[in-house]
Design a protein with these regions (language model features):
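Acidic/histidine-rich catalytic neighborhood
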Residues: 245, 252-291, 449
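Phosphate/adenylate-binding glycine loop and adjacent helical scaffold
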Residues: 339, 454-529
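Polar, surface-exposed loop/tail segments
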Residues: 312-336, 420-452
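Active-site neighborhoods of enzymes that stabilize oxyanions during catalysis
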Residues: 280-412
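A long, amphipathic alpha-helix that forms part
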Residues: 165-172, 182-185, 205-246, 413
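Short, structured active-site-proximal loop/turn typified by the sulfatase FGly-forming signature C/S-X-P-X-R
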Residues: 45-92
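Short, solvent-exposed turn/loop segments enriched in Gly/Ser/Thr/Pro and often Arg
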Residues: 66-84, 141-149, 426-433
Length: 529
């Protein structure tokens, strides 16, 4: 945190590159302006289902890769902070939706504002602070972390999370900001400035993906509704003659995998929970044993590796400081637990108190959520989107670029605004190096769901593999889903107020599933978790 403060001071004193030129829509002058929209849980292949005419037309007029890769773990809060800092979760500090900080001896829980909207957790300068420190006013609509009061300056506008908000209201909010008078216009005011950076969070696809599954009819409808929202926004921008004046960047944070009761592992069957003090994450598990000596960690690791083999590789086991894949960039931070269980995409792990796998298979009980993420960030089912159009992207229409990681988004948006970014892990410079053009309507085979596992006389599944299709996932989804609904400081705050609060809380957002998850955690690991 102290390093973050120092880096901000350095950035404030450094010189910025000349900003892009002011542009006019015929009646008003606009300084460089960029709208960044995040569609939580919008998997890359959702663009190829014939449900998104607005996004397809937008891609055809702009520039995009076939997909963008999220950062590990592919969860909402870590990735939304990566999108606005350009740093890996291990560097910016938000290493999961839920995690234990052994230095502060406190728990980060994105569903509780008092446990998440603490500036000390957020160890990097977000996009809105970078902008404000360089005189570019920012408006942030429900973006995860935007209510945490990070740094020494606040955005000009911050909208608290409201899970009941209609998509049309998001459009009205964005266009309302664009309609404010600019600095040279009559009626201009420092109290109500026209923002140049607008960042907007849209949780709908992720929320319904968890609840109904990414391949469900309901999610198809939700994808179409979100596309309709973007159609209304783009139409409003065109009506204001701002299509060639304002940059629009549409991204997502991760994809989604379908869960199945045949792809569930009972947590107690692979590890002795009496030895574990804290459990972080989900659907991946970070384990903090009471005894974290090197010898005991190796013993637990060896035992879990045997279980990994027994379960035919349906999950992987890693020691943070020994064999965590380098490409995960998931080491060198005490908030990252020392021992990890990472399921294969579509698999979930559940404690028996939350879902009895054997009983679920016997009775046909369905596990919820029906969709999950948080897996290997390079898995095709976790792929996200990036689409951009505007004066900062002067490429031929329909330009294609090579797929890239979401650490690049922060720097791209900074360049579009003409501001100097903080040091980050992105490497892309504008204009993009394009690789020709592509037709966004060209059909792409969607990634396959994981195969359904069935037990047979010749290859019986271990009892722990009986799966809770999405239920465990569901509660987590609630957890991660909340991710879908940003950990917003406001969500946390509202969660603490109870169901009578005027705004929908994150817990309400996940239909009460988080509450059951909280009881499970408390029951097993105590109130500190």
């Amino acid at each position: 945190y102290a390093a973050h403060r120092a880096s901000r001071a350095l950035a404030a004193s450094s010189s910025s590159p000349p900003p892009p030129p002011t542009r006019s829509n015929g009646t008003h002058d606009f300084a460089p302006t960029t709208i960044l929209i995040s569609l939580d849980g919008f998997r890359a292949d959702f663009l190829h289902r014939g449900l998104t005419p607005a996004l397809t037309a937008f891609a055809r007029a702009g520039v995009s890769p076939k997909y963008m890769m999220p950062s590990f773990p592919s969860l909402t809060f870590p990735n939304h902070f990566t999108l606005v800092t350009g740093k890996y979760p291990s560097e910016h500090g938000i290493v999961g939706n839920n995690f234990w900080d052994p230095v502060r001896r406190k728990q980060f829980t994105y569903t509780n504002a008092s446990l998440s909207n603490v500036p000390e957790y957020w160890n990097a300068e977000p996009l809105w602070e970078t902008a404000e420190l360089q005189g570019v006013r920012a408006a942030i609509h429900m973006w995860p972390g935007s209510e945490a009061h990070i740094g020494r300056v606040e955005p000009a506008y911050v909208d608290r999370f409201d899970g009941r908000e209609e998509l049309s209201n998001k459009v009205h909010r964005i266009l309302g900001w664009l309609d404010l008078p600019g600095p040279a216009d009559p009626g201009a005011s420092n109290e109500t400035p026209r923002p140049q950076l607008i960042a907007v969070y849209v949780p709908n696809v992720d929320s319904d993906g968890h609840k109904y599954g990414p391949n469900s009819t309901h999610v198809r409808s939700t994808i179409a509704e979100v596309d309709g929202m973007l159609a209304s926004l783009l139409r409003g921008i065109e009506e204001r003659n701002l299509t060639d004046v304002v940059n629009v960047v549409v991204v997502s944070d991760h994809g989604m995998a379908t869960t199945s009761t045949t792809r569930l592992i009972q947590l107690e069957d692979i590890v002795d929970l009496q030895e574990i003090e804290h459990v972080d994450g989900w659907p991946l598990y970070g384990l903090r044993p009471f005894n974290q000596s090197e010898n005991r960690l190796l013993e637990l690791y060896d035992g879990l590796k045997k279980q990994e083999e027994l379960h035919e590789g349906n999950f992987k086991v890693y020691l943070r400081d020994r064999d965590m894949p380098v490409r995960y960039h998931f080491t060198n931070n005490p908030r990252i637990a020392p021992l990890w269980i990472v399921p294969e995409a579509g698999w979930a792990i559940a404690p028996k108190s939350e879902f009895d796998v054997a009983a679920g298979l016997r009775t046909g009980k369905t596990f919820a959520p029906l969709g999950l993420h948080g897996y290997d960030n390079d898995h095709p089912l976790m792929r996200a989107i990036f689409l951009a159009r505007g004066p900062a992207f002067p490429h031929p229409e329909g330009s294609a670029v090579e797929p890239f990681y979401n650490t690049a988004v922060y720097g791209i948006v900074c360049q579009s605004l003409g501001i100097t970014p903080q040091p980050n892990n992105g490497t892309i410079e504008l204009p993009f190096k394009t690789i020709g053009t592509h037709d966004p309507e060209e059909y792409q085979q969607p990634p396959d769901d994981p195969p359904i596992k069935t037990a047979g006389p010749s290859n019986p599944l271990p009892s722990t593999m009986t799966t809770i299709s999405g239920e465990d996932a569901a509660t987590r989804a609630g957890d991660d889903k909340h991710a879908a609904a940003p950990e917003n400081t406001e969500p946390g705050e509202e969660a603490s107020k109870g169901s009578g609060d005027e705004n929908t809380t994150w817990r309400q957002w996940v239909d009460g599933k988080l509450e059951s998850f909280r009881h499970w955690v408390t029951g097993i690991f105590g109130d500190h978790k």
